[in-house]
Amino acid sequence: MQDRNLIDVNLTSEMKTSFIDYAMSVIVARALPDVRDGLKPVHRRILYGMNELGVTPDKPHKKSARITGDVMGKYHPHGDSSIYEAMVRMAQWWSYRHMLVDGHGNFGSMDGDGAAAQRYTEARMSKIALELLRDINKNTVNFQDNYDGSEREPVVLPARFPNLLVNGATGIAVGMATNIPPHNLAESIDAVKMVMEHPDCTTRELMEVIPGPDFPTGALVMGRSGIHRAYDTGKGSIVLRSRTEIETTQTGRERIVVTEFPYGVNKTKVHEHIVRLAQEKRLEGITAVRDESSREGVRFVIEIRREASATVILNNLFKLTSLQTNFSFNMLAIENGVPKILSLRQIIDNYISHQKEVIIRRTRFDKDKAEARAHILEGLLIALDHLDEVIAIIRNSETDVIAQTELMSRFDLSERQSQAILDMRLRRLTGLERDKIQSEYDDLLALIADLSDILAKPERIITIIKEEMDEIKRKYANPRRTELMVGEVLSLEDEDLIEEEDVLITLSNKGYIKRLAQDEFRAQKRGGRGVQGTGVNNDDFVRELVSTSTHDTLLFFTNFGRVYRLKAYEIPEYGRTAKGLPIVNLLKLEDGETIQTIINARKEETAGKSFFFTTKQGIVKRTEVSEFNNIRQNGLRALKLKEGDQLINVLLTSGQDDIIIGTHSGYSVRFNEASIRNMGRSATGVRGVKLREDDRVVGASRIQDNQEVLVITENGFGKRTSATDYPTKGRGGKGIKTANITPKNGQLAGLVTVDGTEDIMVITNKGVIIRTNVANISQTGRATLGVKIMKLDADAKIVTFTLVQPEDSSIAEINTDRENSISKNKDN
């Protein structure tokens, strides 16, 4: 026999239907707040239950278990733990901007400590919570049956202040979640008033009175663009940063003191995280972490090692720990029974509509009550005006029903009026009592007229809402706790996490680069160039040495006419004897592309200056440094090269420097760079020297009359000549002889200007490296053969040379003044 209680259903359709029902139940009845009062059902039921229980601010606290049990039994049959946890949260100053529950006992801490069991704690409503329920007994909101029909509960509270904005909301439903930040009470009320006064106001205008969230734990909001986006769309993200200060102890050491944490951050977990970072050596320089918080406020201390930078450590803490967090807006709330993501303006509009309805319903309630009372008083006045006749009717009636009927018939009274006359005490028959009744009746008529006027004039309703909110603002508002920082500081750059210190950057002839701590040497002039025993292999040497800061930007110019950029801290640090890292691991160089020049692009040293480019085919170009402010990761074209041409070097010039260019066939030309106008990056340039057939440029330098011109030929001959022997002429000429080229000495391998104290590193086509001091090379005239400076094998030729600091000179002798950071040798 088939059981009639069993119903066959399709599992798929039943799952869909049941899950949708479950999801909507969670969304509407549990997890999301109502846009009108900003409360989820559990919070609304707790507050209403406490109000019905009489646990108001003027009454003693009651056991939390009593409140929880009452709410669970009457309104919220979902377990006592969820009710108690919701009530506890409403009593925590770090959770609610304005607490709705006044807790007595252990209600937890911002360190993550849980509240004591509900049998130990007590609670009552806070004063401001009464404003959410004010006038609830005046038919201001709709009521509905509770879960079993035994009680009635409000669908929404009157909410005389915009609680959804003031205290925010968080909740996870099925397939959706809400995250609305708390705001300042005064600012929220002002925003509501602005919309009522100026219905066309924009989000930007609203932000003039409600500039952003105001979290109970304070802290800093970095930037305002995220706030505007969230207010405009209901979604967005902001950066919250702890309020910190750096103190200096009596012993001169620094410490970081945190006085405010971002909203929702667990102080104990931050403490544990910092200790773990220090132990794992991911964050160095921290010696101790202490929580010195007390009743006076939060004080979280991070002790710093003496030689460490507190600023750098703090920036690392912001990046690695919850001292800086993101708050993601998702302003989802129930609007007309439907979950919806709302903008700030929509939240305010919904609140205003709710308040209008509350005021209208309250006014109607008061008007109906006043009219009912006036109706009674009107009957009493009629009776007093005909007192003798009324008394006679009553005395002559056998029953009160007959008396009531006679009164209604004789004086055209209603049933309620006639009953009030019968219930009237004899003492009210005095003349004095009549005057009181008349006075009350007149007052009621005036009140009824006023209430009718309110209902007839929407502008009066708006005025009442504003006046009552102003009173709440006066009583409960307090200063903003969260500071809104101007500007966008939404992320920390790597530079913020690196301590600024002086370093040396070296590049070897074979393309190995490394960073060395400045204390590897005693001193080094910024922008200087040279070498000092850096331990590279015998077949390699340091060709470029730049003294700089870890925060400085270095520009790398290549033979292909491209320029790349690196921050000094991006170059790996090695010991003095280490080989370093191939430059191709840091820069995306093409096959055959090599670094010709490294220049420190520190702004104060390059401001107003130009880069002077010289190519193998004698083309020169001058371009302002500012043209190279934005260089992509894969480099940028510094100048346009003709086919077969290559960039020889780049000089940093003032715009008025003399330049000398030397050619392979032994000629040179000297001219002032002012004869060349500044050109853009994409320009090719102009002729700097007119080359003879099969000739090419082998060197270019800035030149001053107190310097010397050093030339070295392929067969190992060299000479120094005074710069005064090279007259300044126009650019583009064939030049004058700088060396007498013969088969004996060979063609020119290179030309530089020197001061006479430098060393040179000479490289042959066999890979042999020879080092000598410039002072060992004879000083002769311009058009001379030169002298033999080194012996070469029969088939060996010198292919290039470079200047370096002399081995027997101390780098400590080099001036470290930042203002003179570009050494003369840097541009040679």
Curated annotation (Swiss-Prot):
<comment type="similarity">
    <text>Belongs to the type II topoisomerase GyrA/ParC subunit family.</text>
</comment>
<dbReference type="GO" id="GO:0003677">
    <property type="term" value="F:DNA binding"/>
</dbReference>
<comment type="subunit">
    <text>Heterotetramer, composed of two GyrA and two GyrB chains. In the heterotetramer, GyrA contains the active site tyrosine that forms a transient covalent intermediate with DNA, while GyrB binds cofactors and catalyzes ATP hydrolysis.</text>
</comment>
<keyword id="KW-0547">Nucleotide-binding</keyword>
<dbReference type="InterPro" id="IPR002205">
    <property type="entry name" value="Topo_IIA_dom_A"/>
</dbReference>
<dbReference type="Pfam" id="PF03989">
    <property type="entry name" value="DNA_gyraseA_C"/>
</dbReference>
<dbReference type="GO" id="GO:0006261">
    <property type="term" value="P:DNA-templated DNA replication"/>
</dbReference>
<feature type="short sequence motif" description="GyrA-box">
    <location>
        <begin position="524"/>
        <end position="530"/>
    </location>
</feature>
<dbReference type="InterPro" id="IPR050220">
    <property type="entry name" value="Type_II_DNA_Topoisomerases"/>
</dbReference>
<keyword id="KW-0963">Cytoplasm</keyword>
<protein>
    <recommendedName>
        <fullName>DNA gyrase subunit A</fullName>
        <ecNumber>5.6.2.2</ecNumber>
    </recommendedName>
</protein>
<keyword id="KW-0067">ATP-binding</keyword>
<dbReference type="InterPro" id="IPR013757">
    <property type="entry name" value="Topo_IIA_A_a_sf"/>
</dbReference>
<dbReference type="InterPro" id="IPR035516">
    <property type="entry name" value="Gyrase/topoIV_suA_C"/>
</dbReference>
<dbReference type="InterPro" id="IPR013760">
    <property type="entry name" value="Topo_IIA-like_dom_sf"/>
</dbReference>
<feature type="domain" description="Topo IIA-type catalytic">
    <location>
        <begin position="32"/>
        <end position="497"/>
    </location>
</feature>
<dbReference type="InterPro" id="IPR013758">
    <property type="entry name" value="Topo_IIA_A/C_ab"/>
</dbReference>
<keyword id="KW-0413">Isomerase</keyword>
<dbReference type="InterPro" id="IPR005743">
    <property type="entry name" value="GyrA"/>
</dbReference>
<keyword id="KW-0238">DNA-binding</keyword>
<dbReference type="GO" id="GO:0005524">
    <property type="term" value="F:ATP binding"/>
</dbReference>
<dbReference type="GO" id="GO:0005737">
    <property type="term" value="C:cytoplasm"/>
</dbReference>
<dbReference type="Pfam" id="PF00521">
    <property type="entry name" value="DNA_topoisoIV"/>
</dbReference>
<dbReference type="GO" id="GO:0005694">
    <property type="term" value="C:chromosome"/>
</dbReference>
<dbReference type="InterPro" id="IPR006691">
    <property type="entry name" value="GyrA/parC_rep"/>
</dbReference>
<keyword id="KW-0799">Topoisomerase</keyword>
<dbReference type="GO" id="GO:0009330">
    <property type="term" value="C:DNA topoisomerase type II (double strand cut, ATP-hydrolyzing) complex"/>
</dbReference>
<feature type="active site" description="O-(5'-phospho-DNA)-tyrosine intermediate">
    <location>
        <position position="120"/>
    </location>
</feature>
<comment type="function">
    <text>A type II topoisomerase that negatively supercoils closed circular double-stranded (ds) DNA in an ATP-dependent manner to modulate DNA topology and maintain chromosomes in an underwound state. Negative supercoiling favors strand separation, and DNA replication, transcription, recombination and repair, all of which involve strand separation. Also able to catalyze the interconversion of other topological isomers of dsDNA rings, including catenanes and knotted rings. Type II topoisomerases break and join 2 DNA strands simultaneously in an ATP-dependent manner.</text>
</comment>
<dbReference type="GO" id="GO:0034335">
    <property type="term" value="F:DNA negative supercoiling activity"/>
</dbReference>
<dbReference type="GO" id="GO:0006265">
    <property type="term" value="P:DNA topological change"/>
</dbReference>
